[in-house]
């Protein structure tokens, strides 16, 4: 675990180092543990992309980075500040991930292994805000004890005693977070927001690769939030692990494979796992009115004769917000094609070409266009694997496609 670049590095280093500093009397022996923690904790930071993005999901960010914070506090206090794991420019970017990853109204994407409804631990942002001078007015005051976020024991214990955050002099607020978007260019993830979060559509769009920590095969996945409710998108999960999820059978689970994500299926073939399956960013153009984000997904689909498959997202902020998803397929010969939507809401057809998805308080409509107006069918399937039940809505053109565009307009 000392060589791992995921949350487990920080979790184990924190536990072992904390135990050593508490129980070992010999100062020289304790120093070995401190030196090892300082050295190997670098692997934890390597697990984040250079723009601060956490590929293993927000839940594991909470778990891993909160343990990193406690480890930092242990080393800082035991060395009188001579060792500071925050002495790295990348730490500030990682800390701001918890702010920048929000879509709107406290709703975050559940990309990778993450439960729907997970939010950032406020204590992480308060601790970093105080120690790094991030200038986040929202996290200027110490947050109340969390009841809606899974507790991390070591971080909870640290709050009971003076620490570098509680003893720090509060800095001035005033950091302005880009309200319109956050583009994690190293990770290939875009958060596009409406100017007004009340009753409007904002989105999260995912590229990256299929070899990430706590990976799902989800290139081209997206999340649509209206107001404070996720209506379409990545369903996250699992809520608990089956043993086979840690083996080469991981992607036999539909909710972890691309089948359980709002991404294409070509001739019945789902996405490949592994880093070779990569969403190459073909276009990233952003203005105050609209954001255009195009991903080349060709490498993810092992389909004979597939010359190209791109997914283009256009997010328009006019009105209440509109997301246009366009899949362009180019094959040597016609292939069956399927697009999918994932939802926890109710769905129904409104006319020949429109799907309505309704949540508890909000609803969106999805207008479908297929090549040559050949017609299409819409079917649904309930999926439940170690998590809440979700609905997969499949959209299939009535004939095979060799070249053309399947378009979804969501508003």
Q: Residues of each region from the PLM?
A:
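Active-site lining segments of carbohydrate-active enzymes
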Residues: 1-59, 164-175
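Conserved structured core elements
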Residues: 10, 27, 31-38, 55-69, ...
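Short acidic-hydrophobic surface loop/beta-edge motif
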Residues: 18, 190-195, 222-224, 348, ...
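Carbohydrate-active enzyme catalytic cores, enriched for enzymes
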Residues: 23, 63-231, 285-288, 294, ...
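Long, repeat-rich segments with strong aromatic
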Residues: 34, 41-42, 47-49, 53-70, ...
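Active-site-adjacent bridging/hinge elements
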Residues: 35-48, 198-202, 303, 380-383
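CBM-like, beta-strand-rich accessory domains located in the C-terminal region of large
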Residues: 142-146, 151, 240-411
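Catalytic Cys-His active-site segments of thiol-dependent hydrolases/isopeptidases
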Residues: 232-237
């Amino acid at each position: 675990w000392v060589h791992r670049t995921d949350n487990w590095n920080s979790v184990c280093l924190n536990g072992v180092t904390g135990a050593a500093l508490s129980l070992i009397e010999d100062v020289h022996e304790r120093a070995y543990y401190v030196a090892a923690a300082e050295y190997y904790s670098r692997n934890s930071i390597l697990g984040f992309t250079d723009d601060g993005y956490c590929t293993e999901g927000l839940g594991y960010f909470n778990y891993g980075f909160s343990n990193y914070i406690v480890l930092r506090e242990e080393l800082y206090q035991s060395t009188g500040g001579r060792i500071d794991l925050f002495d790295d420019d990348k730490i500030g970017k990682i800390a701001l991930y918890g702010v920048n990853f929000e879509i709107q109204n406290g709703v975050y994407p559940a990309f990778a292994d993450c439960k729907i409804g997970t939010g950032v631990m406020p204590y992480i942002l308060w601790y970093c805000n105080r120690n790094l001078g991030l200038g986040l007015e929202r996290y200027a005051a110490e947050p109340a004890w969390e009841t809606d976020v899974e507790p991390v024991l070591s971080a909870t214990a640290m709050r009971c005693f003076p620490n570098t955050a509680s003893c720090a002099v509060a800095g001035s607020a005033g950091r302005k977070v880009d309200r319109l978007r956050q583009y994690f260019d190293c990770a290939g993830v875009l958060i596009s927001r409406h100017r007004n979060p009340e009753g409007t559509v904002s989105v999260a769009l995912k590229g990256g690769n299929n070899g990430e920590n706590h990976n799902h095969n989800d290139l081209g996945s997206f999340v649509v939030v209206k107001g404070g409710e996720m209506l379409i998108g990545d369903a996250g999960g699992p809520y608990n692990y089956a043993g086979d999820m840690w083996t080469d059978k991981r992607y036999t689970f539909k909710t972890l494979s691309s089948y359980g994500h709002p991404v294409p299926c070509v001739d019945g073939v789902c996405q490949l796992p592994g880093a070779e399956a990569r969403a190459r960013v073909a276009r990233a153009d952003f203005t105050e009115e609209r954001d255009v984000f195009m991903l080349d997904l060709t490498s993810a689909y092992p389909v004979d004769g597939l010359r190209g498959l791109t997914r283009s997202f256009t997010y328009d902020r006019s009105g209440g917000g509109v997301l246009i998803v366009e899949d362009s397929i180019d094959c040597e010969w016609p292939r069956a094609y399927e697009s999918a939507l994932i939802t926890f809401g109710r769905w129904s057809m409104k006319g020949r070409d429109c799907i309505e998805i309704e949540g508890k308080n909000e609803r969106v409509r999805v207008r479908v266009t297929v090549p040559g107006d050949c017609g299409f069918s819409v079917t649904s399937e309930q999926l439940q694997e170690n998590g809440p039940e979700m609905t997969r809505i499949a959209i299939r053109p009535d004939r095979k496609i060799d070249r053309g565009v399947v378009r979804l307009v969501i508003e």
